[in-house]
Amino acid sequence: MKKIILAFLTFALIFSVSENVYSDDHMGPSNLQIQLCKLNEGVAMDEYDSFVKDEYFKWAKKNDVEVFFARQTPLYPQNSFIRAGYDFVELLNTSHINAGKGWDKWLGTKSGQKLNEKWQKLASCAVKISAVVPNYLNEKALAEDKDRIVSWNWCSLNEGVSYEDLLEEHAKRASELEENPRGLIGWANVYPRIGMEEAPGDFAHIAVYPDVESAQIYQQDQSDGGWKSYRDYNENFASCMGDGFMIEKVLNDPNN
């Protein structure tokens, strides 16, 4: 089971780009909690959804530990997702401090413990923690779009390449997206942190599109010669596994 869960991370570790990465008015790293979930026997999705929206969100707001919360299901899945057998993926994005505060209240208060017990009766979820660093964000589009497409691509640093080299290259490519976003409304990197010692790479590229048509604009750009830039990136900076796509629905955004 452990290998299945970790193999699934090659598919499911998706970044849910939100304005939370703009905390304190600057682009910087934030906490991304990934919940790989399967409904327990006899539990319907509507029942689970009611728990999340009517109980968890209200509890989080009352306790001042709200997070950006999105749920993802596969669009173009790889075999690792199919083998893992999960029903959906939930992503909770906030500051590292707020994430810790939320967990302390979830585990250390009677109200949190009660909800935790109910959550575990409804679904079985494997929880992983990562850090996410934004490169390019269209804030207006991200704030308005609650139903979108998210792609991921796991990569490992090439020999002799430092993270400083990588960040410099990403900054260069982000500036190019400002001129021509090629269908994207967000791009970031996810870095494994806690419970992810067997992650399939050093980091993942995450791209957000408003819809499938926009995602195909990027694919068209690759077909029209953009593949050369992707080849150069793989040769000179990091070796990547290839894209997978998820459908994302934003269920809670404290900023909107």
What is each stretch, according to the model?
Residues 10, 21-22:
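Cleavable N-terminal signal peptides
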Residues 7-16:
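Bacterial N-terminal signal peptides
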Residues 22-256:
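Short S/T/G/P-rich N-terminal loop/turn motif that feeds into the first structured element of a domain
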Residues 1-4:
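Positively charged n-region of N-terminal signal peptides that target proteins for export
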